[in-house]
């Protein structure tokens, strides 16, 4: 029995009907389908409507600030209270008081301070009625007990409404992974956010990738505080890797993170090799150690420009690490502030550091507070002071510097005309001979007078050369009149977290926070004091542009206020021509500053300083030569840092040798014999103390 073949079912089109191709003009239509019962593929046609017919309509995105047009304080307060009633949450009295005090609502308001308020999810949701109507420079959410839900909601609002340029989320330990994920999205999407303070807010392994991705791709952040954020290990590795490609971040604070001297320090050193835009790196209260400092120095050595401030306060550094740093300093061209306080460096470490500092061309501030220095170390520091025509601030507090060391420092200040602040302990040290106590007081007064003399000269030159910029003085020159009972100089912030001013600091220590000083032009929005924590470094500095015109007798130094980084001060130092008669030279056009690498011999001190080097010492001092061989250190550290220590000199005549070196440097043509006798007595006293 034969079964007749059945026709294939029709092929439905897009609308469920049979789609037949229209017959082409002039060609006969097929009389019957193919034998297999299917339509030919070539017979199908697909058509689309014209571009004008595709889009039937368009809706513009909602304007985030549509509620902020001609808004009044009463409207904001009413909307906030209504939202609290709708969400059945409590109103924040602190917020209501601030809202009532606001006047000009058309611009960014200074600060929204919610510090210490407990913010749950519903309370955060009610805040949207404020954020959709008002924008702020600073939003302070410190210690507000945020959880994942509340943090996510707040960060989404701040990102959508661009509510803040400076945000403080410190001391919120429970924002969790979702909170950090929302924070990372805010960092990536908010172009106005410049400052983020996340101190004591843990950034753990599962949250770090979100923040790292935000910092690597697109981030407008210029300042990032991550103190005590549990970064050691994988979080720091992700963060450092991302920051290699970040060109916007200027300040990075990583204190109290238990960073170690191997993997963590290697990541930081690698970061410095590739990132030349980072200006401040604060590593205080970590465990960098000498091995970690070697990695950091290796990164610094490869920088042509970049880091301006390096804070290594309390990192268990010894004289071994100072050998690495002494090799690196001649090669650094931008480092202006170096804080080594509270490290057991000792006299030997300062000797290793001295030659590098003398060959350096950029360091303006040096912190050596509580570094176990004695008179011997003070003599080495005095040699550097006598050679340096650019050092502005020096901190030597909490060291056992007695009569001999003070005498060396006093003599060095006689030939130095740049040092404006020298911090020493106010009370004299105990001496075996009671008469030396009075000698110490007299020497402290001489040192104080020397700094005041330099300060007055700098102020006079600034007023003479730059009358339009009278208010933009350096922090060292902000005091109106030196007080007779002040310490030897204004206090240099030494890097230790200090909730209250120490008794060793005077009114000049806080002068950089006064309102009469001009703000830096690039930052016209200054955060309120509730957000900006005190930075205890010696202070970031902003160097003058390399192409700025300068003459052989005039040098302009631009430095920032210590601890802020938001204010800039300018001082002009004019060097008078030598007293001896010279034939008139033809005027020369301004020349760019000489390249600092390889380092040449230090330039002559300013007017009044006497060149005491003999003809044999006029040649450039070469930097210490790296060792020829040595086993490499782990993590790819160069072998030259492994054997950087110079040979150990004999212990006997070492003290006198250092003192004699200073004696030769400070000898003057007029009172040479008198200075030699005074310095010889100081060296003998310091030698007796060390025995």
UniProtKB/Swiss-Prot annotation:
GO terms for molecular function: protein phosphatase inhibitor activity. SUPFAM superfamilies: RNI-like. Residues 1-43, 460-662 are annotated as: Disordered. Residues 505-523 have a biased composition (Acidic residues). CDD domains: LRR_RI. Residues 468-481 have a biased composition (Polar residues). InterPro entries: Leu-rich_rpt, LRR_dom_sf, PP1-Reg/Actin-Interact_Protein. Keywords: Leucine-rich repeat, Phosphoprotein, Protein phosphatase inhibitor, Repeat. The modification Phosphoserine is found at residues 50, 56, 561. Residues 584-605, 620-634 have a biased composition (Pro residues). The keyword Phosphoprotein applies. Disulfide bonds: none annotated. LRR repeats lie at residues 220-240, 248-269, 277-297, 306-326, 334-354. Interacts with PPP1CA. Belongs to the PPP1R37 family. Inhibits phosphatase activity of protein phosphatase 1 (PP1) complexes. This is Protein phosphatase 1 regulatory subunit 37. It comes from Homo sapiens.
């Amino acid at each position: 029995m034969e079964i007749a073949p059945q026709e294939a079912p029709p092929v439905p089109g897009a609308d469920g009907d049979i789609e037949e191709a229209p017959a082409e003009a002039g060609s006969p239509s097929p009389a019957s389908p193919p034998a297999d019962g299917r339509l030919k593929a070539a017979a199908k046609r697909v058509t689309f409507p014209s571009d004008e017919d595709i889009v039937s309509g368009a809706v513009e995105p909602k304007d985030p600030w549509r509620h902020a047009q001609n808004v009044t304080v009463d409207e904001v307060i009413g909307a906030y209270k209504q939202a609290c009633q709708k969400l059945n949450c409590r109103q924040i009295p602190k917020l209501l008081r601030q809202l009532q005090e606001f006047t000009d609502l058309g611009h960014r308001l200074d600060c929204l301070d919610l510090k210490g308020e407990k913010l749950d999810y519903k309370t955060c949701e009610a805040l949207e009625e404020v954020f959709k109507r008002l924008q702020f420079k600073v939003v302070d959410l410190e210690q507000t007990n945020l959880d994942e839900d509340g943090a996510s909601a707040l960060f989404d609002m701040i990102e959508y409404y661009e509510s803040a340029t400076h945000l403080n989320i410190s001391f919120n330990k429970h924002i969790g992974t979702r909170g950090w994920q929302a924070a990372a999205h805010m960092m990536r999407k908010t172009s106005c956010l410049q400052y983020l303070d996340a101190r004591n807010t843990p950034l753990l392994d599962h949250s770090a990738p979100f923040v790292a991705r935000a910092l690597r791709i697109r981030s407008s952040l210029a300042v990032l505080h991550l103190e005590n954020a549990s970064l050691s290990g994988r979080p720091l590795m992700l963060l450092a890797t991302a920051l290699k490609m970040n060109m916007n971040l200027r300040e990075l604070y990583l204190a109290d993170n238990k960073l170690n001297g191997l993997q963590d320090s290697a990541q930081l050193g690698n970061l410095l090799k590739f990132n030349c835009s980072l200006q401040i790196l604060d590593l205080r209260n970590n465990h960098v150690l000498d091995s970690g400092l070697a990695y950091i120095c290796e990164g610094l050595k490869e920088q042509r420009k970049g880091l301006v401030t390096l804070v290594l306060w309390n990192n268990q550094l010894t004289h071994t690490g100072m050998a690495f740093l002494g090799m690196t300093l001649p090669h650094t061209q931008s480092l202006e502030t170096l804080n080594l306080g509270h490290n057991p460096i000792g006299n030997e470490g300062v000797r290793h550091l001295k030659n590098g500092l003398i060959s350096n061309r950029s360091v303006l501030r040096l912190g050596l507070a509580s570094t176990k220095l004695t008179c011997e170390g003070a003599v080495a520091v005095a040699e550097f002071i006598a050679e340096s025509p650019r050092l502005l601030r020096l901190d030597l507090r909490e060291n056992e510097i007695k009569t001999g060391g003070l005498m060396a420092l006093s003599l060095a200040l006689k030939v130095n005309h740049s040092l404006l602040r020298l911090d020493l302990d106010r009370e004299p040290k105990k001496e075996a001979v009671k008469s030396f106590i009075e000698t110490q007081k007299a020497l402290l007064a001489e040192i104080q007078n020397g700094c005041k003399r330099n300060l007055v000269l700098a102020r006079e030159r600034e007023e003479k050369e730059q009358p339009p910029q009278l208010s933009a003085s350096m922090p060292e020159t902000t005091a109106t009149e030196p007080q007779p009972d002040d310490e030897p100089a204004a206090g240099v912030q030494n890097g230790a977290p200090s909730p209250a001013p120490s008794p060793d600091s005077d009114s000049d220590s806080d002068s950089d926070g006064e309102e009469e000083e001009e703000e830096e032009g690039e930052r016209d929005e200054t955060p309120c004091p509730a957000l900006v924590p005190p930075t205890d470094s010696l202070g970031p500095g902003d160097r003058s542009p390399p192409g700025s015109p300068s003459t052989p007798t005039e040098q302009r130094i631009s430095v920032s206020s210590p601890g802020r980084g938001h204010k800039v001060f300018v001082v002009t130092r004019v060097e008078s021509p030598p007293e001896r008669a010279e034939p008139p030279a033809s005027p020369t056009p301004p020349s760019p500053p000489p390249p600092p690498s390889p380092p040449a011999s230090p330039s002559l001190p300013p007017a009044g300083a006497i060149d005491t080097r003999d003809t044999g010492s006029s040649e450039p001092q070469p930097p210490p030569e790296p060792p020829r061989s040595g086993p490499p250190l782990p993590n790819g550290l160069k072998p030259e840092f492994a054997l950087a220590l110079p040979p150990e000199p004999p212990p006997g005549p070492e003290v006198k040798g250092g003192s004699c070196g200073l004696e030769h440097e400070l000898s003057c043509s007029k009172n040479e014999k008198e200075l030699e006798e005074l310095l010889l007595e100081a060296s003998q006293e310091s030698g007796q103390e060390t025995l």
